[in-house]
């Protein structure tokens, strides 16, 4: 490899908004701040919220049922 053309590879701190901090190596200069990390992300913590899609569909149909009454299905 050619000398002098590669960026410096230094140890930096990655600091999350939740307060968790970790050390890594990067060409980034200075500390890096992130909004979410594996310590606070719902997928990794097991506190994942599942969406109730069946309930959402029922609410949609209930809301727009009145506008569909009396309309014939389109013919193609």
Curated annotation (Swiss-Prot):
Keywords: Metal-binding, Ribonucleoprotein, Ribosomal protein, RNA-binding, rRNA-binding, Zinc
Organism superkingdom: Bacteria
Needed co-factor(s): Zn(2+)
Residues in coiled coil: none
Gene Ontology CC terms, in alphabetical order: ribonucleoprotein complex; ribosome
Cofactor note (record): Binds 1 zinc ion per subunit.
Molecular function in Gene Ontology: metal ion binding; rRNA binding; structural constituent of ribosome
InterPro entries in the cross-refs: Ribosomal_bL28/bL31-like_sf (IPR034704), Ribosomal_bL31 (IPR002150), Ribosomal_bL31_A (IPR027491), Ribosomal_bL31_sf (IPR042105)
Family of the protein in this entry: Belongs to the bacterial ribosomal protein bL31 family. Type A subfamily.
Subunit structure: Part of the 50S ribosomal subunit.
NCBIfam families: L31 (TIGR00105), PRK00019.1 (NF000612), PRK00528.1 (NF001809)
Cited function: Binds the 23S rRNA.
Protein name: Large ribosomal subunit protein bL31
Source organism per UniProt: Solibacter usitatus (strain Ellin6076)
């Amino acid at each position: 490899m050619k000398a002098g053309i590669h960026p410096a590879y230094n140890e930096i701190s990655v600091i999350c908004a939740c307060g968790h901090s970790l050390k890594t190596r990067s060409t980034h200069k200075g500390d890096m701040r992130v909004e979410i990390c594996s310590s606070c992300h719902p997928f990794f913590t097991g506190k994942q919220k599942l969406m109730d899609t069946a309930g959402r569909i029922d609410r949609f149909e209930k809301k727009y049922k009145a506008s569909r009454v009396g309309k014939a299905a389109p013919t193609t």
